[in-house]
Amino acid sequence: MADTAPQPSKRKRERDPEEAEAPSTEEKEARVGNGTSAPVRLPFSGFRVKKVLRESARDKIIFLHGKVNEASGDGDGEDAIVILEKTPFQVDQVAQLLMGSPELQLQFSNDIYSTYHLFPPRQLSDVKTTVVYPATEKHLQKYLHQDLHLVRETGGDYKNITLPHLESQSLSIQWVYNILDKKAEADRIVFENPDPSDGFVLIPDLKWNQKQLDDLYLIAICHRRGIKSLRDLTPEHLPLLRNILREGQEAILQRYQVTGDRLRVYLHYLPSYYHLHVHFTALGFEAPGAGVERAHLLAEVIENLEQDPEHYQRRTLTFALRADDPLLTLLQEAQRS
């Protein structure tokens, strides 16, 4: 069973999902409002399933592509993506359920073992629902299952291939600036160091509902602009990185009573968006992107920069790309030539 997270006195709403679970920068930029506990409706009428883009029995999640608003006279309707995910259990609610007389159907019984289908009440049967609407072809491809391929990017590859490719894309991060400028999600900020050069904000990741600690997940977003990724880091950024590591761990300890040795603190490369940010997750949580091919522990990043000022400009970095990613083709062609 999951630990129960302490509930702050004025905690407001949470929302969602990264990688395949994450909203794109365009999606995040659009959500500048705050949530509400009042009943609401989906932002479209009807939903005719066209395709299951992806599903995972292990993660209890499914990604659906559908047509909406078909009855409103908009021709063939519009595309939308709906992501349905079972929410984690909460100890107090489950304990209360089992103390009562839950509705059960026996599936299997043998000696001391038995399996049932249990039909929970409404408060235990919620499904986290993420909507991407209107959805573009780019969104559909993003959530569609794709094979992954490992690539090894040299420092030269980054300067000559990856960076020009990124600069050719329209990768808006206005949603990040909205958070930093308190235009959106200000009520969700757990901690802030306001220093414009070496400060940051700490905010719960959208994948974490803050109702239990087993899947604790927060993001530190630096105030300083222009640091795109690990490749940009030099000793000039050590004060910022040390602040994020030390103050982020202290803030999480104070707020959630989780010590630093129970946290995984790391950066992604490649990141999902190009403004420096650091992930804080519960050590036992298998967070998306926490594998060795993408996660770089912040403590080791700091040590690498202390020992070699140009470590991340020189080092060959390994990461995975989807089969349909144009960058994969560019890097593979360069390595063959």
From Swiss-Prot:
EC number: 3.6.1.59
Presence of the UniProt keyword Iron in the record: no
Family named by the database record: Belongs to the HIT family.
Protein name (Swiss-Prot/TrEMBL): m7GpppX diphosphatase
A GO term, aspect molecular function: identical protein binding
Keywords on record: Acetylation, Cytoplasm, Hydrolase, mRNA processing, mRNA splicing, Nucleus, Phosphoprotein
Chain's role: Decapping scavenger enzyme that catalyzes the cleavage of a residual cap structure following the degradation of mRNAs by the 3'->5' exosome-mediated mRNA decay pathway. Hydrolyzes cap analog structures like 7-methylguanosine nucleoside triphosphate (m7GpppG) with up to 10 nucleotide substrates (small capped oligoribonucleotides) and specifically releases 5'-phosphorylated RNA fragments and 7-methylguanosine monophosphate (m7GMP). Cleaves cap analog structures like tri-methyl guanosine nucleoside triphosphate (m3(2,2,7)GpppG) with very poor efficiency.
Annotated region described as Disordered, given as residue ranges: 1-37
Gene: DCPS
List of catalytic residues: 277
Locus of motif Histidine triad motif: 275-279
Residue window of motif nuclear localization signal (NLS): 10-13
Domain notes: The C-terminal histidine triad (HIT) motif and the N-terminal domain are required for the decapping activity. The N-terminus is necessary but not sufficient for binding cap structures.
N-acetylalanine, modified sites: 2
Residue ranges annotated as motif nuclear export sequence (NES): 142-154
Entry keyword annotation includes Cytoplasm: yes
Phosphoserine: residues carrying this PTM: 24, 101
Assembly: Homodimer. Associates with components of the exosome multienzyme ribonuclease complex, such as EXOSC3 and EXOSC4. Interacts with NDOR1.
GO BP term, example: deadenylation-dependent decapping of nuclear-transcribed mRNA
PROSITE patterns assigned: HIT_1 (PS00892)
N6-acetyllysine PTM sites in chain numbering: 138, 142
Membrane-crossing residue ranges in chain numbering: none
Source lineage: Eukaryota, Metazoa, Chordata, Craniata, Vertebrata
Activity regulation, per record: The hydrolytic product 7-methylguanosine diphosphate (m7GDP) efficiently inhibits the decapping scavenger activity and acts as a competitive inhibitor in vitro. Inhibited by 2,4-diaminoquinazoline.
Residues reported to bind substrate: 175, 185, 205, 207, 268-279
Subcellular location(s) per record: Cytoplasm; Nucleus
